[in-house]
């Protein structure tokens, strides 16, 4: 066979494929044996990625997707994407996935997850085709579908990464068939993939070098006739580069260069099992750089020392593929970009998965046994790490769900201690930021509301680090907040509260959940003329509402500021049973601590929402809710008076009652 498989049986590095079986000659059992790995890879991927389908929009999705609204499909062909990029096909797909008047995240996540699973199946097919070993192919497919280090890519709604990995794998598989069978149809399919990839993402210019690497491997291992046909696949990439460089760019030009630290960071994409193990073992007290170096060296030693002459060439192929696929990110992006963009690890992830799956490609039983144990370890580790990342993204997305639900009511909202990004305290890998970018300051929170509901409203974001610190001490996260300047007890905080219709506070729980709650409002004019009572000469209690919700009471107080309180003055809210025994309390400054009474401005109306949580259910009976103020310096309470001006006992003004049946 001039252009067929002409490998020498005497060469230990040359694959020896069995004769092909026609599908119609296979028995049902043989059919089942063929499709079982594909079914298993798909099922594993569905279980792992099902939660991803429930994610909302985050990061810069409103801009990246929303920019297509004002343009026709034809105009998208000439529109630069995200400042310095040209991705017309990506924009066309993003526009097509908008299925209603407003945007829903589900079609975008379904698109990405579906192509991620398809890519895993295609990797299985490519590996099985090249190496004729179902165990290697299955391991590579499972490792890819669970690849944990680049989860950001398939999890982000506006991402096209899963699709263009599919194009890459189809192109390589098709080219291999074309060279072995001299099939024009497969050459054409490869060219189609090479033409479609660059308009999706600039990583498409790396597909021709990947094909050239495969051509060299086929010449080396399959003894095919020399051919220069691989060079034709550079044509679409060159045309794309001409167009890309001719587009006016408002963003910063890529900082082209070869950098050692960036290479070390990116090496975690191939050394990920060992790099993860280093972090799980707390790095043995070593610096992050030393950990990454040790992980890279250990991974290289393990992969090469466990290879024989028979299995070394496929490993070399996978590693070179990984390096080529990673090279554009390495030479074009500085570490400041890379370390907060783990999605760059995703494009080469199929080659990394192939390299680790390759440890099963051996003739010696003991080597295959070692390889099998290693693959099982990496799969289990990848599964647990992926679940951690998925849970992190779910928590961030649930927070965004709350933003949108609250925001669709319109008006002006002030968000306090809202996350910009957050990550686990336990670093998943030695170098980099392995968290979630929820809502960077480049996007206003109102953008997400308008994008998904069509409601136009306004938001501001501020941080109060002093009030946030106790939550952070108990939280599993490190958090960067929106409005990074500390506005604690400042005029900026007060004026922003005046500007807002509602003030929304983010709670960070021990279990990692993020909850937004309404904490109050301040109005410069009085909207209420009622009176419950007065606390000293500092404030009137104009109104109150009490609502029981399971094991908690929601108490909302309406204060009218009369004169300045002392800096040490604070508020108490008590829950008393029928015998006047204290059974619960919600003491502290107004608006969840944001505004101490000393900050109140005379004549302003302060709505103060509090939540009192009980450790156990309240027993049946009637409960009184009382309020007052005291000086923290000496514990002395202010006198309190009812609406008729009569002084009440113990400085406790009753503002409501609740009955538990």
Question: For each predicted feature, which ranges?
Answer:
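Polytopic membrane enzymes that build or remodel cell-surface glycoconjugates and lipids
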Residues: 2-10, 27-462, 472, 482-486, ...
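C-terminal luminal/periplasmic domains and tails of membrane-associated envelope-modifying transferases
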Residues: 3-8, 23-26, 404-412, 418-423, ...
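Arg/Gly-rich low-complexity intrinsically disordered repeat tracts
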Residues: 17-29
